[in-house]
Amino acid sequence: MITIHDRYVNNELLQFISRPQYDTSCSMSSLTAIINYLYSDQIGIKTTKEWAEEIETHSPDINMAPGNQTVLEWFRMVVDKYNLKGNCGYFIKDEDVDWDNNPEVISKLKQAVRCRNQALIYHMSNHYNIIAGYFENSQNPDDAYNNKAKLERWIVLGEHSDFNPIPKIIQKLIMKLPSKIMSEDAKNLLMERAGSPPIWCRRWGSIRNDLISTPNHCIMSFRRE
């Protein structure tokens, strides 16, 4: 049997990404994907506005910064409202993780991503994303198919907005750069890689550092029982 680097993308979960989202509804839109992925066979497809109205919370077109606990509580309310079975909680939160045992953390994350009855949301930079897969590759081109080589790990994220981490003022400066410095296509490529793709990746090392250094950032788990 041929063994190569471990790579996986949950295409079924990606099908439920609620895109586009309302301007400031990343928390609710990410949860919409989770609800539909886990329970659409029981309750049908729900839009963000539909489930928000049915649990009597605020509309997604209203600007609100709900926080992690609120997102978890919304899920519990949806489960109760539709008489479903499920649970949720923090999957990775810095103070609860043995970061010295990185292989165990990675193994646990992979198992969760591959589990049909579970889905994960990553809270980063005041933004929420679906974790839809992972990708491993060697650090040396001669080891491209050597599964014992030292690895670079990426986490595949499902994006429901045009979230762009580049500040607006910097975006404007980039687009004003003359073509002798950066072509129009290069500027568009930079903006698109930074902002709008429905699927993108972030290095596991960067996510790990983010979760360690930023107290409010975390990975949340939502599971169907």
Where are these regions (language model features)?
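Short, charged low-complexity linear segments at domain edges
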Residues: M1-I2, F222
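Cysteine-nucleophile protease catalytic domains, especially the papain-like/related folds used
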Residues: T3-V97
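Extended interaction regions within the primary functional domain
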Residues: R7-L13, N102, K108, I207-N216
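Polar/charged alpha-helical tracts
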Residues: Q15, E50-E53, D80, S107, ...
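Intrinsically disordered, low-complexity regions enriched in proline, serine, glycine
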Residues: I35, I43-T47, N87-C88, I131-G133, ...
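Conserved active-site-adjacent core of cysteine acyl-enzyme catalytic domains
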Residues: E53-S161
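Noncatalytic regulatory segments and standalone regulatory/sensor domains
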Residues: Y134-E225
